[in-house]
């Protein structure tokens, strides 16, 4: 392959998105459109990657540089100060290349999220094989409104491209359209750009006019037709963004299915492009797997589960759970109605049950937190059991502190752990205990006082009530000790 450079056009205003977010930074399948574009071109053996920015450059340029760093590729930024058309944008992009660059220049857009490395590689190979001045991708649309139409000779040769605003009625009837993805000989491109004129309905310098100029100069001009129109579809508004997101999601889902994952209802399952799932895992309806989520084999996920940047081990079950930046060990069970906040790490064969919330907590192998519990800023050892309705009280209004629970600990229901506090290995707590001091290994912690039964209280304080009648029918008396007559005895 000849030396290659890639120019990504990302300077458009994106007004039809009606958004404060730059168009190319809108996301689908867990990546911005610009990220999709850079991932596609990063797979090419291109010497130079250039992103042309204009409006919102203070947000788009740093994003491009960060994505490039993630991909291990240097990205050069070129600035289009004035919006004078696509031809002018490419001119700006060429300023970021060495003046003596003579290879192939690939031009694509930052709002074509499904374009892939394979399609671009084929374009470059076809272009180089014919020593062409210009090679462009085309596709056929049932409704070509808004796209440039491909003009051909009777024998099929490409004459040029006419934009929608400049097309005649007969030209608008053409359904083969320009995909706005090109490969150019650098010399031919520079020469043609220097001769562009803004004598058109938009008053802009059209990159598409380069095709006709290159042909008139005697250069070879070729077109490669793409049957899969979604690969080269652009995004101008949120409707198109949602449409392409659905197409991409369906392809991602099918890829996992073909790799051995059972997805019960593809229509209600959304999976980001960077998610990995092991074989024989079952994904149930209403599930969203987002970000860099990684799921092992033989797991069960869902229904109605959202996991973002979560690692799930082999054989785990995660049911009706919302999790972010968490780790779930092999053969663990989570849910239903469990909330895993960042920093949660559940060991193998553990359990986080119904209405449990965890945050910044490490929970050891075989440990169970079965019901109605908040575990925040905590370390729990192995094979412990946390009773229902327990709370790890980690915040005093100013500082968050940690609680440490040992291994083989059993805590009663409604235990409150007031951090910072440590419960030693093998210790127990009674129901309703408020643990304010460290509990030694093997000890039983009990903070509640003895129970007092004030007999006859209902008959005296709620005479005539249904409760009093039921008590009387059960043989309850009205007498009570004198010391139990005061308001402190009755809670009144």
Swiss-Prot record:
Residues that, per the record, bind acetyl-CoA: 388, 394-395, 413, 431
Active site: 371
Protein name: Bifunctional protein GlmU
Ranges where the record places region Linker: 239-259
Lineage: Bacteria, Bacillati, Actinomycetota, Actinomycetes, Mycobacteriales
PANTHER family documented for this protein: BIFUNCTIONAL PROTEIN GLMU, NUCLEOTIDYL TRANSFERASE
Species for this entry: Mycolicibacterium vanbaalenii (strain DSM 7251 / JCM 13017 / BCRC 16820 / KCTC 9966 / NRRL B-24157 / PYR-1) (Mycobacterium vanbaalenii)
Gene for this chain: glmU
Co-factor binding comment: Binds 1 Mg(2+) ion per subunit.
Reaction catalysed by this enzyme: alpha-D-glucosamine 1-phosphate + acetyl-CoA = N-acetyl-alpha-D-glucosamine 1-phosphate + CoA + H(+); N-acetyl-alpha-D-glucosamine 1-phosphate + UTP + H(+) = UDP-N-acetyl-alpha-D-glucosamine + diphosphate
HAMAP family for this protein: GlmU
Gene Ontology MF terms: glucosamine-1-phosphate N-acetyltransferase activity; magnesium ion binding; UDP-N-acetylglucosamine diphosphorylase activity
GO BP annotations listed: cell morphogenesis; cell wall organization; lipid A biosynthetic process; peptidoglycan biosynthetic process; regulation of cell shape; UDP-N-acetylglucosamine biosynthetic process
Location of the region described as Disordered in the Swiss-Prot/TrEMBL record: 469-492
Co-factor requirement: Mg(2+)
């Amino acid at each position: 392959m000849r030396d290659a450079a890639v120019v990504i056009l990302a300077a458009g205003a994106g007004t039809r998105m009606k958004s404060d977010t730059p168009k190319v930074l809108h996301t689908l399948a867990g990546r911005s459109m610009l990220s999709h574009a850079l991932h596609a071109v990063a797979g090419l053996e291109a010497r130079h990657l250039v992103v042309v920015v204009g409006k919102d450059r203070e947000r788009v340029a740093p994003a491009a540089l960060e994505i490039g760093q993630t991909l291990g590729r240097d990205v050069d930024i070129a600035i289009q100060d004035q919006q004078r058309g696509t031809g002018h944008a490419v001119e700006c992009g060429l300023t970021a290349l060495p003046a003596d660059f003579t290879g192939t220049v690939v031009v694509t857009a930052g709002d074509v999220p499904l374009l892939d490395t394979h399609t671009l590689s084929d374009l470059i190979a076809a272009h180089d094989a014919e020593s062409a001045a210009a090679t462009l991708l085309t596709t056929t649309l049932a409704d070509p409104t808004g796209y440039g139409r491909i003009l051909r000779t009777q024998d099929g040769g490409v004459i040029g491209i006419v934009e929608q605003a400049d097309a005649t009625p007969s030209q608008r009837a053409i359904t083969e359209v320009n995909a706005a993805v090109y490969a150019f000989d650098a010399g031919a491109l520079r020469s043609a750009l220097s001769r562009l004129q803004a004598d058109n309905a938009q008053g802009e310098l059209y990159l598409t006019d380069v095709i006709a100029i290159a042909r008139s100069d005697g250069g070879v001009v070729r077109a490669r037709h793409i049957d899969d129109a979604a690969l080269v579809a652009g995004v101008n508004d949120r409707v198109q963004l949602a449409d392409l997101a659905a197409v991409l999601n369906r392809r991602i889902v099918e890829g996992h299915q073909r790799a051995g994952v059972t997805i019960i209802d593809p229509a209600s399952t959304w999976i980001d492009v960077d998610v990995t799932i092991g074989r024989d895992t079952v994904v149930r309806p209403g599930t969203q797997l987002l970000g860099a989520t990684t799921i092992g084999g033989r797991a069960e996920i869902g229904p109605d589960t959202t996991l973002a940047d979560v690692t799930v081990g082999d054989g785990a079950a995660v049911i009706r759970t919302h999790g972010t930046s968490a780790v779930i060990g092999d053969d663990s069970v989570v849910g239903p109605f469990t909330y895993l906040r960042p920093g949660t790490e559940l060991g193998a064969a553990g359990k986080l049950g119904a209405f449990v919330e965890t945050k910044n907590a490490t929970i050891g192998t075989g440990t169970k937190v079965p019901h109605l519990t908040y575990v925040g800023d905590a370390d729990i050892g192995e094979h412990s059991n946390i009773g229902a309705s327990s709370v790890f009280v980690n915040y005093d209004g100013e500082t968050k502190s940690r609680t440490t629970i040992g291994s083989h600990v059993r805590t009663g229901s409604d235990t409150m752990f007031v951090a910072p506090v440590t419960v030693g290995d093998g210790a127990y707590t009674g129901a309703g205990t408020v643990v304010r001091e460290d509990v030694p290994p093997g000890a039983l912690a009990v903070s509640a006082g003895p129970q007092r039964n004030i007999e006859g209280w209902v008959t005296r304080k709620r005479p005539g009530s249904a409760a009093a009648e039921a008590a009387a029918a059960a043989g309850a008396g009205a007498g009570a000790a004198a010391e139990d007559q005061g308001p402190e005895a009755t809670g009144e």
